[in-house]
Amino acid sequence: MSHAPQPLGAPVARREGRDKVTGAARYAAELNLPGCLYAWPVPATVPHGRVTAIRTADALALPGVHAVLTHENAPRTGEPDDPILAVLQNDRVPHRGWQIAVVVADTLEGARAGAEALHVTYETVPHEVVLTADHAGLYTPETANGGYPAERERGDFDGAFAAAPVQVDTTYTIGPLHNHPMEPHSSTAHWSPEGHLTVYDSSQGATKVRDSLATLFGLRPDQVTVISRHVGGGFGSKGTPRPQAVLAAMAARHTGRPVELAMPRRHMAAVVGHRAPTVQRVRLGAERDGTLTAVAHEVITHTSTVKEFVEQAAVPARVMYGSAHSRTSHRVTALDVPSPSWMRAPGEAPGMYALESAVDELATALGLDPVELRLRNDPADEPDSCKPFSSRNLAACLRDGAARFGWSDRDPRPGARREGPLLLGTGVAAATYPVYASASHALAHAAPDGSYRIAVNATDIGTGARTVLAQIAARVLETPVDNVTVDIGDSDLPDAPLAGGSSGTASWGWSVHKAATALVERLGENSGPLPAVGVTVTADTTEETAAESPYARHAFGAHFAEVAVDSRTGEVRVRRMLGVFAAGHILNSRTARSQFIGGMTMGLGMALTESSTLDAAFGDFTESDLASYHVPACADATGLEAHWIDEDDPHLNPMGSKGIGEIGIVGAAAAIGNAVHHATGLRLRTLPLTPDRLLSALY
């Protein structure tokens, strides 16, 4: 054990790492509670309609089956704030995969057999699941995800675009994408004899799950405990409560025993959200020297009939490049599809793919280096709000990345480099992600033996949150990080926001920093030995996080990629990929690099392998498991490097940090797509860039 304080930013190893690799860390579906039963959800097999009958006799006759819950016998719940949680409350089927029953048995295999033994009949009505750019049901919502105005108009875009001597007018298409965390969405629920509900849940935010369950089951928040000590990823899909927690709690109440429900992988696409498909038209007008004079980004996407969710893909165009004349808009149509939701960098990931691809097309039209074009249009103030940036080091990221990557040696001519049948190319794209922070509470405790304890209902979804929070506290307390215990992932701890929006560490860390600072002050007032119970202080950052900042706060980055395109097979391989990021003060260099590279890997998947399709006839996602939905494997993601700019930004939070969980994916797909264009001379505007699409374009 080290006895010297480590500087904030040191590459401290994850403190739970050994427990995870040895199996000591227990996830939501690994608890083996005494008397635990197992549940299997039953999805609707029609795309739209209602259930007319569910015959349960055959299922209940199977050995070990204890119960079948349907809309006819499930507990009635209160009105949820999220309609996707209103499961088993009526006979409605808004989309294929909507859960219509749950079977509970002694074993998982028995529950699955019971589900297969159910006989369900439906009344169907016409359905529609395919998004088109000219869909008759398109409308303009009031806001897009994040509360952003759906439309924004600055100056006279039409006039400026018409007058621009150089124009780009292109449309980019991305299909639905799925989060697919390693750990499926899982819950284990049990009720005490006194009526207290405890749920072990695979969630990005136990506080919100607790509050939702309390509302649904008519309980006070203090009658519900939600525990999420270890979570195997989420990428946004566990950022809101999901139906498995409700179904497990229902089944546990009905049977009087603990119930475990792990969502089957093939069910997840229809239940836990997805990145909505987008059709994005981007128009750029520029002077011949590359100065942008007109920017338009218009997005078409889908939502469900259950609730509205609008992917904010046009919002990044409001902050990236300066132009007095701009138009950004979102239009959406409600289809008979599962409800879309957050997926790593919602809005920014698809939006920056389209925008950065269009910027590359503009560079080609101008005959200008794509790095130089971005540098010439780097604004001093945020174009949307006109606020000064708290810090904007995009130019430094581009320059540093270009130097590290060897960009100056690039032959700008498309299709100029070959290795036998392989066509080689390089591409670049910029990245941005907003800086968020939410109100959080934390507790700091000093024990008489000189150790410290931090408590905050944060969630570690694989990011290393425990470790970083210990580092923040240790820095303030001027003690070795091993001298600080961190308790997280329990709704009985001080309330804290979810792990999402790249805001978790900023939010929780702010409250931990404040609590630790208050503890130092309290200890400074104590001249004698500590009492046997120690000293405890709490902190609340509601006031600080609610204060409006006079600055526009964003993280920035730049991606550089080199690809090899096999002219015989159409296969694209990323030979190397380099990202440079400006994300405030990096709090742990080891976990930060992991986050950056993880995001870049997801961007690679978005560009080359990940694809999902809604079946027009049957209404479901045809790529519903990892055999058909292809996430990158380790062999696909070799040669990835992540670096960062040391950034001192005093306008953020006490740590000077920006979020890093999402910016790695932003722009990554565009850099790869731009590299494919440079290799082949062909511009493909539909993701992913699969071999069949490359071959069709090549020949």
Task: Cite the ranges covered by each PLM segment.
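Extended active-site and interfacial segments that coordinate phosphate-rich ligands
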Residues: 15-19, 116-123, 127, 204, ...
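C-terminal catalytic domains of large/alpha subunits in multi-subunit enzymes
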Residues: 71-72, 218-225, 253-259, 288, ...
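Short acidic, glycine/serine/threonine-rich loops at helix termini
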Residues: 78-82, 114-117, 201, 210-212, ...
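Flexible, low-hydrophobicity surface segments
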Residues: 1-145, 167-170
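Short glycine-rich loop/turn motifs
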Residues: 90, 183-188, 279, 438-443, ...
